[in-house]
């Protein structure tokens, strides 16, 4: 959570009505986000400076591992994710039908996603699928559930938005079971602080880096496809 003092209290109160162990990562907020979370009695990880999405996920993974949690649901604090969807992504993990459950915005197309975001997400997801052999619809969804095996065996390293792809690449290499569940994401205005072009480019570069490390044979077959997709991304952005 980064500067979410206006929404964090309501979110935590609603979550505490259904769930016991709640972790909030205060990612260098300059407002009262961290103080509010602490007063409401949840587990708070405090970053002295903003480390970004990847830094927050890394810290949450480590804390969940330390607490020996059986499952971890990652959930945005900006109001885009619906609390009622948590049980949907948690169910396959509880029933041992998957190691990772991803909440997808595209399986039922009920999320009113801004056009530029949809194009960017689908481009990055396409690159991820080509480079890993996965067949998923939303590689960039942050609404996920991980089981204990994932928490114990995967050590994310990316500090940026590329961490979502990194986890998928490492999971595929380990032959972990990945499933997607349809969810609805609420877009009221544009809550993102990321420049879409910078974000897209950074995720693509992260994907190339992790594919070259984890799947070197695949890496040399996708540069042309990546450059082609980047061209499409920039072309659409200028329309």
Task: For each feature predicted by the language model, list its residue ranges.
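Hydrophobic helical membrane-anchoring modules
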Residues: 133, 157-239
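Acceptor/aglycone-binding surface of glycosyltransferases and processive sugar-polymer synthases
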Residues: 43, 47-66, 71, 83-161, ...
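Short loop->beta transition adjacent to catalytic acidic/histidine clusters or analogous donor-positioning motifs
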Residues: 14-23, 32, 40-42
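Short, well-formed alpha-helical segments that are part of the catalytic scaffolds
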Residues: 2-17
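Acidic helix N-cap motif at the loop->helix transition within catalytic regions
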Residues: 6-10, 31-40
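Conserved sequence signature across two-component system core domains
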Residues: 1, 25-27, 47
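A conserved acidic beta->alpha catalytic loop
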Residues: 26-34, 79
């Amino acid at each position: 959570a980064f500067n979410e003092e206006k929404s964090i209290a309501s979110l935590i109160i609603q979550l505490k009505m259904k769930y016991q162990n709640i972790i909030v990562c205060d990612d260098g907020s300059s407002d009262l986000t961290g103080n509010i979370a602490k007063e409401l009695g949840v587990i708070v990880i405090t970053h002295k400076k903003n480390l970004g999405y990847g830094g927050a996920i890394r810290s949450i993974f480590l804390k969940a591992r330390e607490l020996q949690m059986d499952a971890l649901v990652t959930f945005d604090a900006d109001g885009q994710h619906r609390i009622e969807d948590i049980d949907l992504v948690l169910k396959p993990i509880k029933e041992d039908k998957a190691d990772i459950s991803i909440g997808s915005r595209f399986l039922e197309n009920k999320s009113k996603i801004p056009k530029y975001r949809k194009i960017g997400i689908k481009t990055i997801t396409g690159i991820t699928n080509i480079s890993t052999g996965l067949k998923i619809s939303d590689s960039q969804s942050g609404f996920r559930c991980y089981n204990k095996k994932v928490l114990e065996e995967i050590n994310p390293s990316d500090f940026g938005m590329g961490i979502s792809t990194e986890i998928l690449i490492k999971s595929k290499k380990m032959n972990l079971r990945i499933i997607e569940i349809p969810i609805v994401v609420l877009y009221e205005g544009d809550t993102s602080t990321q420049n879409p072009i910078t974000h897209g480019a950074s995720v693509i570069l992260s994907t190339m880096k992790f594919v070259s490390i984890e799947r070197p044979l695949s890496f040399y077959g996708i540069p042309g496809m990546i450059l082609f997709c980047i061209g499409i991304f920039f072309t659409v952005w200028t329309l």
